[in-house]
């Protein structure tokens, strides 16, 4: 045996299951994957070494823990899609020489790249770029990381790549960085921190969706660019499944169903981002509000109402102005009889109004907690390109509550708010819920109010409550509000998409700004702590998500029309009216269809209208004082007396259960 081999250093690699693998120093993540199995090596996207994601080609230098990252994980998808954006840029550079590249990140579903090019991209170009991406993938080009001094990288991108955008990033964003990383992919090179795929060969299927206008660094005063969106997968099967899910999502689009089911309308004459509830949609909203109001009453909340506008000084005091000035409507200026000017804002938040309600009288420690609740409408000047039906609007109603409590009550009150939010989601059929503890970014203190000590205590309280409620949570650094940390609830709908809905927030800042107090057992004034809480988040957004989650097949208690009576022939119209009236008196939302149409057509149209129950009556039912009951999407449920049928529906309404579990079928 040679002297070199005798002296070769062996490293110990510990896998997630606790087993260890001895490997020579300099082995790579791909070597580890191959040691475990060739199939895993084929599926590997990157590897975590001591908890940090790195390239599969990175050499090992010490004993470590290792975990292979595959496409199945969120982190794996992000790495795969980020690499796909590089492959797309590579393809564009080959097809359209002279193109320059801005930002090209992975996003929640795929990736995009901003391109500066004299060529105006078309749909036909997208198909050509897809083909070239697959051709590049077929070349099995290694994706190689190179670390380089920043000064040298500036010269490289200035003279070799001739890319002014990367030069700007290197001289501006990364000016404090000594060493940067580049990724080479054959003749294409990009500036990136990585990690990336081992080779282009991992990409097996790609779809580019659309082209939109963008600006360099999102600044409208800078260069105009073209943004191309796409998604890629390691198998053709996964792409087909994704495209199928997109088609299903189109069928479930709340804007489409909202029109078809006559739930709400959007009118340019009223204004962009200002949805109007039609009678059927208003019923859904009223039912949800009544449900939460009753649950809040049971849990000790007190209802309040506040105006739609407020003096601008109120929002300056709270800090909402200027923190949210970019997303607020311009102030309204009012001059009184003496010419004195006062400025008002369309209410961007309910919080300041509630704080003044709390401070309108002296509070004792025995009075706390005080739980104020309101369905309060607020207004945000969202950019027109960000508006999306109900889920992103300029005027929306929050199920807002503010809880004022003593320090010894805080964790209990946070837990109660978490419990209420969970109850709401479970009742509405959202069974997959992720929880994010949104913390402040200590490197960006100017973004937040309050002191470092206050933030440390608030975040400690949030963690304690989450742990007590046995929540599986993840940390979101920089996701906190300016006044405190949050517990954000992210639901997964029937198509697997994620939506952030409810929130619970702890606030030590506003009590100081509004000089809130209570008299303690020692006779001295003390500061309460505020909890901001909204299980729905906003009524508009929640209902928009609920429409898509259920595909408009609402549970019986929420359905705008809970049943329709369908007479088979004209000679039983009178009996149909009798059945309808009995159901109406019982409190069931019911309609009567007396059109001169065949019963089969009436049933089909009731199914299309997604009415939960069809009550069919013919001569036999009239003579027997009965009805034939049919359930939407399921079919015949049998014969019942009018009273039995009414009781059956009322029991199901009272139970507030989903009539059927949400499915992927509309």
From Swiss-Prot:
**Obligatory cofactor(s):** Zn(2+)
Name where it mostly resides.
Answer: cytoplasm
The UniProt catalytic activity note for this protein reads: tRNA(Thr) + L-threonine + ATP = L-threonyl-tRNA(Thr) + AMP + diphosphate + H(+)
Does the keyword section mention Transport?
A: no
Quaternary structure annotation from Swiss-Prot or TrEMBL: Homodimer.
| Family per record | Belongs to the class-II aminoacyl-tRNA synthetase family.
Which function does this protein serve? Catalyzes the attachment of threonine to tRNA(Thr) in a two-step reaction: L-threonine is first activated by ATP to form Thr-AMP and then transferred to the acceptor end of tRNA(Thr). Also edits incorrectly charged L-seryl-tRNA(Thr).
- The protein in question is named Threonine--tRNA ligase
In the UniProt record, the gene name given for this protein reads thrS
């Amino acid at each position: 045996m040679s002297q070199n081999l005798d002296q070769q250093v062996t490293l110990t690699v510990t896998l997630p299951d606790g087993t260890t693998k001895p490997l020579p120093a300099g082995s790579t993540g791909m070597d580890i994957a191959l040691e475990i199995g060739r199939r895993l090596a084929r599926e590997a996207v990157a590897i975590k070494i001591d908890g940090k994601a790195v390239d599969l080609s990175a050499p090992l230098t010490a004993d470590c823990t290792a975990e292979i990252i595959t496409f199945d994980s969120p982190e794996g998808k992000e790495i795969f899609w980020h690499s796909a954006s590089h492959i797309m840029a590579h393809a564009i550079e080959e097809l359209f020489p002279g193109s320059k590249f801005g930002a090209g990140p992975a996003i929640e579903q795929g990736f995009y790249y901003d391109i500066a090019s004299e060529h105006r991209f078309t749909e036909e170009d997208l198909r050509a770029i897809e083909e070239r991406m697959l051709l590049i993938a077929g070349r099995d080009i290694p994706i190689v990381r190179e670390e380089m001094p920043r000064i040298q990288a500036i010269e490289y991108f200035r003279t070799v790549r001739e890319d002014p955008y990367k030069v700007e990033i290197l001289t501006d964003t990364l000016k404090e960085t000594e060493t940067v990383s580049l990724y080479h992919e054959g003749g294409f090179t990009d500036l990136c921190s990585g990690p990336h795929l081992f080779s282009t060969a991992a990409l097996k299927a790609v779809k580019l969706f659309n082209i939109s206008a963008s600006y360099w660094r999102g600044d409208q005063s800078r260069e105009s660019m073209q943004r191309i969106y796409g998604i890629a997968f390691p198998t053709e099967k996964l792409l087909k499944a994704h495209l199928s899910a997109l088609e299903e999502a189109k069928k479930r689009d709340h804007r489409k169903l909202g029109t078809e089911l006559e739930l709400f309308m959007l009118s340019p004459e009223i204004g962009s981002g200002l949805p109007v509830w039609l009678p059927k949609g208003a019923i859904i909203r009223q039912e949800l509000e009544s449900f939460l109001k009753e649950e809040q009453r049971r849990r000790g909340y007190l209802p309040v109402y506040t105006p739609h506008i407020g003096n601008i000084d109120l929002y300056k005091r709270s800090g909402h102005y200027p923190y949210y000035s970019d997303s607020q409507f311009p102030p309204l200026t009012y001059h009184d009889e003496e010419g004195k000017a006062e400025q008002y804002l369309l209410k961007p938040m309910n919080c300041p109004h509630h704080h003044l309600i709390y401070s309108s009288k002296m509070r004792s420690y025995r009075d706390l907690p005080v739980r104020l609740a309101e369905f309060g409408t607020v207004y945000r000047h969202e950019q027109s390109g960000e508006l999306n039906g109900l889920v992103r609007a300029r005027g929306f109603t929050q199920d807002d509550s503010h809880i004022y409590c003593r320090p010894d009550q805080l964790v209990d009150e946070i837990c109660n708010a978490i419990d209420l939010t969970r109850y709401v989601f479970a009742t509405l059929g959202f069974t997959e819920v992720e929880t994010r503890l949104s913390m402040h970014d200590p490197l960006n203190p100017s973004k937040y109010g309050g002191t470092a000590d206050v933030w440390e205590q608030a975040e400690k309280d949030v963690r304690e409550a989450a742990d007590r409620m046995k929540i599986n949570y993840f940390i979101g650094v920089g996701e906190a509000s300016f006044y405190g940390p949050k517990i954000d609830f992210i639901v997964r709908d029937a198509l697997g998409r994620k939506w952030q809905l409810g929130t619970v927030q702890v606030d030590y800042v506003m009590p100081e700004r509004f000089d809130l107090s209570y008299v303690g057992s020692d006779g001295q004034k003390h500061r309460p702590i505020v909890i901001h809480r909204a299980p729905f988040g906003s009524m508009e957004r929640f209902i928009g998500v609920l429409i898509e989650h259920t595909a408009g097949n609402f549970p019986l208690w929420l359905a705008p029309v809970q049943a329709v009576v369908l007479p088979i022939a004209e000679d039983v119209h009178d009996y149909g009216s009798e059945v309808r009236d009995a159901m109406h008196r019982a409190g069931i939302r019911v309609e009567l269809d007396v059109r001169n149409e065949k019963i089969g057509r009436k049933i089909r149209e009731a199914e299309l209208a997604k009415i939960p129950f069809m009550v069919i009556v013919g001569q036999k039912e009239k003579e027997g004082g009965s009805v034939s009951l049919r359930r939407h999407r399921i079919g015949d449920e049998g014969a019942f007396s009018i009273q039995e049928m009414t009781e059956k529906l009322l029991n199901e309404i009272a139970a507030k259960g989903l009539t059927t579990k949400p499915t992927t079928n509309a």
